[in-house]
Design a protein with these regions (language model features):
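N-terminal low-complexity or simple alpha-helical regulatory segments
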Residues: 1-117
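Extracellular-loop-to-transmembrane junctions of the mid-late helices
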Residues: 2-13, 119-156, 197-207
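Residues within membrane-spanning alpha-helices of integral membrane proteins
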Residues: 10, 14-17, 42-52, 109-112, ...
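Membrane-water interface of transmembrane alpha-helices
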Residues: 17-26, 83, 146-162
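Juxtamembrane "helix-exit" motif on the non-cytosolic side of transmembrane helices
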Residues: 27-30, 57-68, 119-131, 191-201
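The cytoplasmic-loop to transmembrane-helix boundary for the fourth helix
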Residues: 94-121, 136-143, 168-187
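Interfacial "cap-and-anchor" motif at the non-cytosolic start of specific transmembrane alpha-helices
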Residues: 182-238
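Membrane-proximal linker segments that couple transmembrane helices to downstream signaling/catalytic modules
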Residues: 223-270
Length: 270
């Protein structure tokens, strides 16, 4: 691969990545409490975009892929693993404000540390040869499986959201957020594929980099549009939560009444 083509692809993608990342991180939202969760989701997505931008920057300014291929593989795999967690968390938060917990955050951090450490051991300590190739393949499989599991969580969350909107007769909103499902399947194909694309022959790497431009552009466009309907979406979720709480309360009340009748019945017979 000619460095000029590779550099041009990075030169094209990097400014957009930086713009999207900083915009997601610092752009304002309507000053309403209901938008707090949307803002957190967008900021997490912004952090993920800036991490990817940092990855692209190292490739662009230092040409690490040409100087040390092993370090390039390690950096890419470690970055993608962390970004998978950030992407999935940001998207699910749009439809489940309770998704992020301390336990889940620490679990993802620990998994990332373990994955990055093992990747470093395989790349730098395991001798080149069949054992190293098998180990790298195993790590790539782990990365892909991790991405698929997270993508499945996103899809399940969105299907639940569509069900809620269908039950509340909010078809217009339900149809509108179907972009989330579309984006999720796109992310599954493109994002999870990064685990395999890390091992692409050099002459095809620029195609992978350029293909990221429409992917992240669609993400930016979708977040901007989703902001228009976010308040209605949150209100629909609030109604669903209240309905579930009412059903739970009614169920507990009926259970208590039945229990009282069972207790009083023998006494009345006396």
């Amino acid at each position: 691969m000619e460095p000029s083509i590779y550099s041009f692809s990075l030169y094209t993608a990097l400014p957009l990545m930086l713009f999207f990342g900083f915009y997601f991180l610092f752009a304002k939202t309507p000053e309403k409490k209901i938008f707090k969760n949307y803002l957190r989701s967008r900021q997490i997505m912004g952090i993920a975009m800036l991490l990817l931008s940092a990855n692209y920057s190292v490739h662009f300014f230092f040409g690490i892929r040409f100087k040390n291929a092993d370090s390039s593989i390690l950096m890419n795999m470690s970055t993608y693993f962390l970004c998978y967690s950030l992407f999935s968390s940001a998207l699910i938060m749009l439809l489940d404000r309770f998704y992020i917990t301390k336990r889940r955050v620490w679990t993802h951090i620990i998994l990332w540390i373990i994955f990055s450490t093992l990747s470093g051991v395989v790349v730098f300590l395991v001798p080149s040869g069949i054992i190293q190739k098998i180990s790298l393949f195993a790590l790539a499989v782990w990365l892909v499986v991790f991405g698929v599991v997270l993508a499945r969580r996103v899809i399940v969350a969105y299907r639940r959201a569509i069900r809620i909107f269908n039950e509340t007769q909010a078809d217009d909103i339900g149809a509108y957020i179907e972009w989330l499902s579309i984006f999720t399947y796109w992310a599954l194909i493109f994002g999870v594929g990064c685990g395999l694309l890390t091992f692409l022959p050099d002459e095809y790497v620029f195609i992978w980099i350029l293909s990221s431009i429409p992917f992240y552009s669609y993400l930016f466009y979708s977040y901007q549009n989703y902001l228009l309907f976010y308040e209605q979406v949150e209100n629909a979720f609030e109604q669903d939560i209240q309905s579930e709480e009412e059903l739970l309360t009614n169920s507990e009340t009926e259970h208590d009444i039945v229990s009282e009748k069972e207790v009083l019945s023998p006494i009345q017979n006396l």
